[in-house]
Amino acid sequence: MRPSNRTPAQTRPITITRSFTAHAEGSVLVEFGDTKVLCTASFTEGVPRFLKGQGQGWVTAEYGMLPRSTHSRMDREAARGKQSGRTQEIQRLIGRALRAAVDMKLLGENTIVIDCDVIQADGGTRTAAITGACVALVDALNWARGKGIIKANPLKFLIAAVSVGIYKGEAISDLEYIEDSAAETDMNVVMTETGKIIEIQGTAEGEPFSHEELLELLVLAKNSIREIVDVQKAALS
Amino acid sequence: MRPSNRTPAQTRPITITRSFTAHAEGSVLVEFGDTKVLCTASFTEGVPRFLKGQGQGWVTAEYGMLPRSTHSRMDREAARGKQSGRTQEIQRLIGRALRAAVDMKLLGENTIVIDCDVIQADGGTRTAAITGACVALVDALNWARGKGIIKANPLKFLIAAVSVGIYKGEAISDLEYIEDSAAETDMNVVMTETGKIIEIQGTAEGEPFSHEELLELLVLAKNSIREIVDVQKAALS
Amino acid sequence: MRPSNRTPAQTRPITITRSFTAHAEGSVLVEFGDTKVLCTASFTEGVPRFLKGQGQGWVTAEYGMLPRSTHSRMDREAARGKQSGRTQEIQRLIGRALRAAVDMKLLGENTIVIDCDVIQADGGTRTAAITGACVALVDALNWARGKGIIKANPLKFLIAAVSVGIYKGEAISDLEYIEDSAAETDMNVVMTETGKIIEIQGTAEGEPFSHEELLELLVLAKNSIREIVDVQKAALS
Amino acid sequence: MRPSNRTPAQTRPITITRSFTAHAEGSVLVEFGDTKVLCTASFTEGVPRFLKGQGQGWVTAEYGMLPRSTHSRMDREAARGKQSGRTQEIQRLIGRALRAAVDMKLLGENTIVIDCDVIQADGGTRTAAITGACVALVDALNWARGKGIIKANPLKFLIAAVSVGIYKGEAISDLEYIEDSAAETDMNVVMTETGKIIEIQGTAEGEPFSHEELLELLVLAKNSIREIVDVQKAALS
Amino acid sequence: MRPSNRTPAQTRPITITRSFTAHAEGSVLVEFGDTKVLCTASFTEGVPRFLKGQGQGWVTAEYGMLPRSTHSRMDREAARGKQSGRTQEIQRLIGRALRAAVDMKLLGENTIVIDCDVIQADGGTRTAAITGACVALVDALNWARGKGIIKANPLKFLIAAVSVGIYKGEAISDLEYIEDSAAETDMNVVMTETGKIIEIQGTAEGEPFSHEELLELLVLAKNSIREIVDVQKAALS
Amino acid sequence: MRPSNRTPAQTRPITITRSFTAHAEGSVLVEFGDTKVLCTASFTEGVPRFLKGQGQGWVTAEYGMLPRSTHSRMDREAARGKQSGRTQEIQRLIGRALRAAVDMKLLGENTIVIDCDVIQADGGTRTAAITGACVALVDALNWARGKGIIKANPLKFLIAAVSVGIYKGEAISDLEYIEDSAAETDMNVVMTETGKIIEIQGTAEGEPFSHEELLELLVLAKNSIREIVDVQKAALS
């Protein structure tokens, strides 16, 4: 029934490659099937002006798509001179989610910028990005601990994300592009490694959905995220 | 317990004033307590280029805050030369929600732009905006039917929105600013007049939240939205 | 003869509502007939860099129109990414006029920003804005004196403004939109409460005008401004 | 008494050099003493979209200062990415003034763009620009008549401009920079060759001014403009 | 003597991976040692407006660096709102070089956009980009021929590029970052597969260089490019 | 054979006028035939932030074309809100070339900005700009030495530039516009007064060129630059 013959609850093959590029303190290529996102974590000492002198750190994220990561070429945002509303919405989501996973006091007056650049898109880029970014964040934190810049581990828990939705009347997990573009309802869920909710964003693309459907989607998301966290842990071990 | 002595489930006084300004096809001042948003609906014939010739209409929204609608003055976005990520995120939410309420085929090749401008902010501006924008939309649709530009009523149902959250460990509805800035969890919910979900966006500002808390918030939102729809209906009658 | 049946020298009903919104140190809704402008004055300690250490203050203004304050919807300047030349011309005029009314030494190293946002436009928005902004300025100065931030009153005199013009061959005062768009000559005058000139900007939209016509317009402006100042004084008392 | 030993009514030496550059249909270097502005008129067939099919033409102007036309270097507007409010205010003034001199019906569906670029600044750049632009406009109109693109002469009258002001308590004409920066009142006047008013913009930089002072300044302006028109006519003959 | 122990004439290991991503008509990852650039060629029917109806095609290029492709993080150009001068200079160079390799008449009214995005930077990104872009271009042309969109092969010859320079007094080929940043002279050379020159850009970073040094660098470049073309041909066969 | 009847090696008449405008520390009008560029050098104490405290100076350049310096009017870059890629490429070239001529240690913590504004264009504007800018630079350096701001002369050597190219199969020097637009190969060369190379940028506009053609062009450039340096020296003496 699904174009890929997956069962409703089945995610795509998920792989996480650490140290994908050389310079960043954390550099992860995350793949959810044909969706491939490069997540780099850049650690710098110091914080933005609005946080100076408060003894706490900052984590933020930026998101971009390579112009031909998509089926037809998109305009390059740098050439157009501004980031789209979609881009801003996504990078705000990624940043919020990562900040929830970090104890800012333990991070001290240091900043981590996570860049999530989509190399190839096939649906679910924002949830793949959060999943990969969390691993890059861990690597950057470990780098800083190895350097003695921070003492205790600021990571409160791993976070991971998945998209779920209602497609042809059925709740499915980890939608690929052709499912996503035909879905009646689309929901992105970010959870901790213990299944608590960090962020939930559900949208009725077609018909409004009921509380029952919402609950069904949540269960699906929780199960998928448990599997995804296992992939994160395997990559980190 | 709440700064305003409201019960957890109690919304602020909500008023909807139609025909607040003279030129727009729909013009509504919506007030959720001290949050005041002017929502105007502008009806024009024709659609954006990407929809031409498809026999369907378009609904979109823009959002702004007057520089001193807030406690301390914010920079004017027109002077800075760009809209913030927050602004774009909100106006995309408003637009999506309103489009869910309209049958685009019945709208025909016509466009409605909803401008939501915050005159005074005290938390919940985006949910107030959606609530007021829906009434302005109805007025603009009725205007167009009165002019004979559209035949059947494209409105599928009324929509309304409320913010709910966990504040000092308790689930409360319709957060005002001091509650919102201290909330552990913040959730914006958009529903139809019959209580189906259009959009749900929940964020753990502090600690991650559980499924039980999510359910509790949803019930609170559903009840509040039922009341808010009654205010919409009273204003429209 | 005038669309509103006013006599040539007659202004529209002018009302000034103080404390229109809650947060600003001065907040005034000024109405010249159907033209409605919200003027807020924001008082902050400190001055822009170019004035630091000179023992004097700064007053500046920004102007905007809500997209549907006009007959047909205008593009939102924040979305277009820049303020129009008209907007900049008007806000420079408002700022210059207000600075003329303030003793910058007595203001001390403090800044007042006046935001003039047009809620509904029917001609004469810039002169209404100056008139309302002056009252908001007074409120902000009084607020600062009440707080003990400034000692002596920096206000040198009240200022007010009106548009005058030649319409169907006759000099008239306080043009509304349909008069304004058909006027042969359009002149905006800003004066002190004692009738001295702060700014005069006259433009031949159609035929060039003579010195005699200029003088006639000035007399008209002086008389109208005297009345408008009375409204300001009544609002402030 | 004046830094240049001029009498109050005396303008600086004014020269107008036509055909200063090779490519433009009209190209004029205008000098008011040490203020030097290059004014080029570019004639193109066709009109902007908002005028299409109405059988009339369009005249507009743009203004710029070379970065080191001034005493200390100004930022290049092209590098900063926007034109200042002052620039926009000035180019709007120049455009309005020139449009007043042209019969748009006789111009037909053709456009003239006047570029006024300040090579060297010593006060009065906008009035010098208007004066030179008018001559460049005449050359471009004659070029188009020579080509047979337009039949009748669309020029209604020559226009010229001068700045006048109150300096050390006395009304003076054609202020140079050090006078301008110390003037209590500054007024720019644009008139037709027969002394009718096209535009008047007077600002109290220091103290408000009286009607008597305004009249005195107007007389001064009228006399100076009469002389300046003579220079235009000599250059054109 | 070289940090990598290469001989002066020795290039880094060069690899070209085709079909690196799925959507583009040509997609190549090119590696010059640790410099890695993703080059995608997007083929679309139609040409930009300035070429319409002339029976010829268009080839253009855009260039970007991922923010953390470099040792320390660079600002994201999309977030800053503009491309740097360096970026524009490089993408203009890539576009010119590729256009020299294509017969625009045989391409017909079709457009190819080449996006060169630097995944990891270690010197020579622009020459690596040209080398990889040429292979992506060939793939896109073959794709279009396979589809029957174009008949004859528009490729005139392969092109490839290398950077050469004078480092510690000696002419060397294919500079890596630490050589590049210390080089006295830096020269980028683009040649055809038969060794004719498409573009040469040489800059004295330290001391001016002599004609003899220029010749020596050219010989070095020619030899390296011959080797690089062999890598291109092997990748394409 | 050349449109101007020049011999292949013959440059256009070249004139250099110093002190062309009044305010700049160096102000030069350079003319290569009908190409006229105003080059001003602005000397200011202090350096940009990235150089602070390093005991060395900075030289940079900006380039612009007046909108009607060209055959048909170009958009004003300040109005469009950004500099074109071509503009940025050229001003980067000018800046690099001038920095090669200055000993930054001897300049001390001072900055020189060179503005090159094209008054009239007929090919070769960037090489004319470099030639004129060098003379303006010398004047600014001498001004600073006269003021005692710098002690020793930071100028290492004069630099000058010329464009050469292959036109109708023959190597020619100092191309004017109609030659430039038809040239098969176009090369800009910047040299020191002793004939060493500062920058060489050669582009095959049509067919790729051979090493022999490159050498021929270089000889031509060297001879022309020797003559141009003589004009510089004559102007400076």
Curated annotation (Swiss-Prot), chains A, B, C, D, E, F:
The keyword Isomerase does not apply. Coiled coil: none annotated. InterPro entries: ExoRNase_PH_dom1, ExoRNase_PH_dom2, ExoRNase_PH_dom2_sf, PNPase/RNase_PH_dom_sf, Ribosomal_Su5_D2-typ_SF, RNase_PH, RNase_PH_bac-type, RNase_PH_CS. Phosphate binds at residues 86, 124-126. GO terms for biological process: rRNA catabolic process; rRNA processing; tRNA processing. Disulfide bonds: none annotated. GO terms for molecular function: 3'-5'-RNA exonuclease activity; tRNA binding; tRNA nucleotidyltransferase activity. It catalyses: tRNA(n+1) + phosphate = tRNA(n) + a ribonucleoside 5'-diphosphate. CDD domains: RNase_PH_bact. Keywords: Nucleotidyltransferase, RNA-binding, rRNA processing, Transferase, tRNA processing, tRNA-binding. Homohexameric ring arranged as a trimer of dimers. Phosphorolytic 3'-5' exoribonuclease that plays an important role in tRNA 3'-end maturation. Removes nucleotide residues following the 3'-CCA terminus of tRNAs; can also add nucleotides to the ends of RNA molecules by using nucleoside diphosphates as substrates, but this may not be physiologically important. Probably plays a role in initiation of 16S rRNA degradation (leading to ribosome degradation) during starvation. Belongs to the RNase PH family. This is Ribonuclease PH. It comes from Shewanella frigidimarina (strain NCIMB 400).
